[in-house]
Structures are given as structure tokens and as C-alpha cells.
Amino acid sequence: MGAIPLEHGLAVAGILFCLGLVGLMVRRNILFVLMSLEVMMNASALAFVVAGARWVQPDGQVMFILVISLAAAEASIGLAILLQLYRRFHTLDIDAASEMRG
């Protein structure tokens, strides 16, 4: 069983990134926006791992760990903002977030 070719891995990462970007631009629900951001971050992490595996360097795996930790921080902060938005305005519409400015 061989390794995944670089072109295929980067193509999958690019497709996932584009799907996340479309979800980010199209959806108005903040939960789906957060999910789209997670897909985009995981796509970039996949690109790092594939490139690192191609050149037999551990840098791709190090960047993967960094991206995953950033994604966890982004998810926790995003979910905290989501909860406050829902408690205050009883909606998850991202346009209501502009009203959160004190």
C-alpha cells in the first residue's frame, strides 16, 4: 500500500478549503460559519501533512498540531460568542452580531 500522491492530497485539501470558503460566504447562521472555518483550517492542516510527508520532513506534522490547537481555541471562543449572541438576541443570525457592540 503506497502513499497518497502529493497532487491528490493537495487537490483534496484545496477542494475542502473551497467548500469551507463557500460555506463561510453563503451561510448566515453563526454555527455554520464556525463549522466552515473548521473545515478550512482542517484543509490547511491536511495540506501541511501531505507536503511534509512528500519531502519526509516532520515540519508538516508540527504545523498540523499548531493548526489543531488554533482550531480548538477558535472553536471555544466562537462557541462562547455564539452562546452570548443566542442568550441576548435569541437568534444565531450573524447580522445580529453587529448589534452586540456595546
Swiss-Prot record:
It catalyses: a quinone + NADH + 5 H(+)(in) = a quinol + NAD(+) + 4 H(+)(out). The chain crosses the membrane at residues 6-26, 30-50, 62-82. InterPro entries: NADH_UbQ_OxRdtase_chain4L/K, NUOK/Mnh_C1-like. Pfam families: Oxidored_q2 (PF00420). Gene3D superfamilies: 1.10.287.3510. It is an enzyme of class 7 (translocase). It is found in: Cell inner membrane. GO terms for molecular function: NADH:ubiquinone reductase (non-electrogenic) activity; quinone binding. Coiled coil: none annotated. One of its GO terms (biological process) is ATP synthesis coupled electron transport. Signal peptide: none annotated. Keywords: Cell inner membrane, Cell membrane, Membrane, NAD, Quinone, Translocase, Transmembrane, Transmembrane helix, Transport, Ubiquinone. It is a multi-pass membrane protein. One of its GO terms (cellular component) is plasma membrane. NCBIfam families: PRK05715.1-1, PRK05715.1-2. NDH-1 is composed of 13 different subunits. Subunits NuoA, H, J, K, L, M, N constitute the membrane sector of the complex. Belongs to the complex I subunit 4L family. NDH-1 shuttles electrons from NADH, via FMN and iron-sulfur (Fe-S) centers, to quinones in the respiratory chain. The immediate electron acceptor for the enzyme in this species is believed to be ubiquinone. Couples the redox reaction to proton translocation (for every two electrons transferred, four hydrogen ions are translocated across the cytoplasmic membrane), and thus conserves the redox energy in a proton gradient. HAMAP family: NDH1_NuoK. This is NADH-quinone oxidoreductase subunit K.
